[in-house]
Amino acid sequence: MINYEYPLSERVRTLLRLEDLYDRVEYFIAKNEPLEHHVALLSIFEILEVSSRADLKSDLLQELERQKQTLEALRDNPEISEEALDNVLWQIDQASSRLFQASGKVGQELRENEWLMSIKQRTNIPGGVCEFDLPSYHYWLQQSAEQQRHDLQQWLAPFLPIRDGIMIVLKLLRESGKTSSQVAYQGVYQQMMAGRMAQMLRICLSREYPCVPEISANKYALNIRFTTQEGMQRPKAAETDVEFELTFCNL
């Protein structure tokens, strides 16, 4: 099965972008080759840009507090495991505490590092990080993998409280949804929202279908059009019925 997630708000869109970047940087930091660590640093620069939104930290803190209050209300529910509930609440408390302790603008330490910012500036130029452009960076890339990994982890560290908060919020968001089986006849599916609230849609599709969903949604209607991709040709509308699972996620 292949999962597709579609954010219905700018906030969730930002969280999904950051989640993808965190996954990427952690993957490449664990590698050993200089080019892989170069990609890790570029991903840290992207995290710096995406997380620079002024209200990101406060949004996460507010959402974590709201979820904590919601979960606390479930404490006397016999269908809820007390142990599981306590574990989630502990994770929320830990993430909130780390966010509170992260003073100032997210990533300010990196912005004040002139050497890193000189590299970041050159990355905006195609081919701008050649060794003759940035000899000091070329020298760093020739150091041991352990030294590079240590440096990268230090540069990533200021963003980890944000990552922890994002992981909890997205986990709760994904688990909030109710899944239903649907069919897109001739590759097209439409549904009136009728006041249904959702922050994210999830579409789960069997790998046997050689098609991908194109999604458009607003507060009035949801439209999904499945298209097929053949080689380098333009996508074409699917001509067969497509069975899929649809989940509306909302906190």
Indicate where each model-derived feature is located.
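N-terminal ordered "arm"
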Residues: 2-62
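Alpha-helical rod/repeat scaffolding segments in eukaryotic adaptors/tethers
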Residues: 4, 33, 78-85, 109-112, ...
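Alpha-helix boundary/N-cap detector
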Residues: 9, 13-16, 59-62, 83, ...
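Charged, amphipathic alpha-helical oligomerization/scaffolding segments
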Residues: 13, 17-20, 24, 39-42, ...
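Hydrophobic/aromatic-rich structural module bridging two neighboring secondary-structure elements via a short loop
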Residues: 52-115
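Charged, well-structured binding/catalytic surfaces in domain cores that contact anionic ligands
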Residues: 95-200
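Extended, charged low-complexity segments
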Residues: 199-251
